[in-house]
Amino acid sequence: MKKHGVLNSEIAAVLASLGHTDTIVIADCGLPIPDGVKRIDLAVEIGKPSFLDVLQVVADDMAIEKVTLAEEVINNNAEVNKEIELKLIEPAFEYVCHEQFKEHTKKAKAIIRTGEATPYANVILHAGVIF
């Protein structure tokens, strides 16, 4: 049995398969998931697991070069935006409109759906390298 890092086998496999600049998405329960993109559905009820809890676990196990968020999060969910900025200090941040954000999700290796039910609690994580 694995002792550290991501225990979910689907998430662990996706993280292990990422190459430089590949992307994964951590999403609230309302973000549409495009056909053809791997869906890892963790949502068990509203709020569980939370977006920030899942982000923390994934970020601890992934080299992240860049973060993309919908610019609407700034005015519509400032608390989540602030927490993301506090948790992810090193990567570059990019803000795009929500429609562009949804277009970018079509290229993701996987979308991890949480139980989060607050506006624009979604992030695209761009894989970096460990060297």
UniProtKB/Swiss-Prot annotation:
Gene Ontology molecular function: any one: monosaccharide binding
EC number of this enzyme: 5.4.99.62
Keyword terms of this UniProt record: Carbohydrate metabolism, Cytoplasm, Isomerase
Gene Ontology terms: cellular component: cytosol
Leading EC class: isomerase
Cell location: Cytoplasm
Pfam families named in the record: RbsD_FucU
Enzyme active site: 20 (proton donor)
Residues holding substrate: 28, 98, 120-122
Top-level division of the source organism's lineage: Bacteria
Protein's pathway: Carbohydrate metabolism; D-ribose degradation; D-ribose 5-phosphate from beta-D-ribopyranose: step 1/2
Keyword Iron recorded: no
InterPro entries: D-ribose_pyranase, RbsD-like_sf, RbsD_FucU
Catalytic activity: beta-D-ribopyranose = beta-D-ribofuranose
Single GO BP term: D-ribose catabolic process
Free-text function comment from the UniProt entry: Catalyzes the interconversion of beta-pyran and beta-furan forms of D-ribose.
Subunit relationships: Homodecamer.
PANTHER family documented for this protein: D-RIBOSE PYRANASE
Family: Belongs to the RbsD / FucU family. RbsD subfamily.
Name assigned to this protein: D-ribose pyranase
Name of the coding gene: rbsD
